[in-house]
Amino acid sequence: MTLYSKPGCPQCKVLKMKMDKAGVAYNHIEDEDAIIALGVKAAPALVVEGAIYTGPDAIKWFTAWAKERANGN
């Protein structure tokens, strides 16, 4: 799992905090150019096994994934 964020991005901060709280191992790249290189314009960008989730969808996806993980699924 790789989190791409940019400085000053409130949604990026929220997602990073959720990922840290869940104790998930992930790579964090804080670089707006790296986000653009992915072909997306929104931050945060969360890359999971080739799928890219961006903006609020990244937070929603991670929240649901973390909940399933906590329930043993």
Task: Please annotate each region the language model reported.
Residues 2, 45-48:
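A near-ubiquitous, low-amplitude feature marking generic local secondary-structure context
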Residues 31:
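Active-site loop/turn elements of alpha/beta-hydrolase fold enzymes
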Residues 14-18, 43, 58-62:
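Non-catalytic interaction surface on structured domains
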Residues 47-73:
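Non-catalytic, surface beta->alpha helical segment in thiol-disulfide oxidoreductase systems
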Residues 34-36:
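Amphipathic, hydrophobic secondary-structure cores in small proteins
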Residues 1-28:
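Local sequence-structure signature of Cys/Sec-based thiol-disulfide redox active-site neighborhoods
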Residues 38-46:
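Structural micro-motif
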